[in-house]
């Protein structure tokens, strides 16, 4: 459909990431270079207990294959810390997986029992204070990776789909192809439009930019 300029899909389970879908990330240029690919944990024994049906190395291989066909692809994921039976080494395995892959963002949570699931009947529970410490450590690593990625975008020009008014007067908020939130001083008539924007600032949570004009081009030259 020619009128569709950008395509995203919400998420994919690693076990469903077959060769055809991997190739699509290289072949379909309208498919945005951001993929939410949940892994949940790093050690294989925890992945097995979660019934994830993939290993940590299989996850790494999928990421490597995707980056071969789309080198600019960035990843988001989900993590659960403190799953029953998780040891200090298991947690370190998760941290190493994060270091190996490098994520642009992630959703992370402490394990809590869900009635009706096999894990709800497990007895080798992790102490609450240990879960909290592990979650803090994991979130700090993800935040550092996200900030590094955002900083690497400063000075670049990116296409932004403006979605809504920002919090400040005259400000719009949009999304980059990498799904980063970006705030730009711009006319609200641009909401719903895809516009070239120069990234001028970066924080851990969002970017700041300015609409690319002939004047801004001269300024950055």
Regions picked out by a protein language model, each given a short descriptive name:
Residues 1-88, 99:
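Conserved SAM/AdoMet-binding glycine-rich loop
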Residues 120-221:
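Terminal RNA-binding accessory module
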Residues 16-20, 39-50, 81-88, 104-129, ...:
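Flexible glycine/acidic-rich beta-alpha junction loops that bind and position SAM and/or redox cofactors
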Residues 59, 91-94, 131:
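Aromatic/hydrophobic pocket-lining residues that form the small-molecule binding cavity
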Residues 21-22, 94, 184-185:
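Short beta-alpha junctions and helix-cap segments that line functional grooves
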Residues 9, 37, 78, 98, ...:
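Conserved, mostly hydrophobic/aromatic
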Residues 25-26, 94, 123-126:
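Short, hinge-like loop/turn segments at secondary-structure boundaries
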């Amino acid at each position: 459909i020619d009128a569709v300029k950008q395509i995203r899909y919400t998420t994919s389970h690693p076990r469903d990431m077959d060769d055809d879908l991997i190739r699509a990330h290289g072949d379909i240029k309208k498919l945005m270079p951001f993929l939410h690919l949940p892994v949940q944990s790093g050690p294989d024994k925890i992945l097995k207990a979660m019934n994830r049906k993939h290993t940590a190395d299989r996850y790494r291989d999928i990421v490597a294959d995707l980056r071969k066909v789309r080198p600019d692809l960035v990843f988001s994921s989900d993590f659960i810390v403190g799953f029953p039976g998780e040891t200090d080494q298991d947690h370190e395995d998760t941290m190493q997986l994060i270091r190996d892959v490098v994520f642009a963002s992630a959703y992370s949570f402490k394990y809590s029992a869900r009635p009706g699931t096999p894990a709800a009947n497990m007895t080798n529970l992790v102490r609450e204070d240990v879960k909290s410490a592990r979650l803090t450590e994991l979130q700090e690593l993800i935040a550092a990776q996200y900030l590094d990625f955002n900083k690497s975008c400063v000075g670049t020009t990116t296409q932004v789909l403006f979605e809504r008014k920002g919090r400040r007067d005259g400000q719009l908020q949009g999304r980059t192809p990498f799904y980063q939130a970006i705030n730009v001083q711009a006319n609200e008539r641009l909401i719903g439009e895809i516009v070239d924007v120069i990234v001028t600032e970066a924080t851990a949570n969002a970017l700041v930019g300015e609409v690319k004009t002939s004047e801004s081009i001269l300024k950055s030259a």
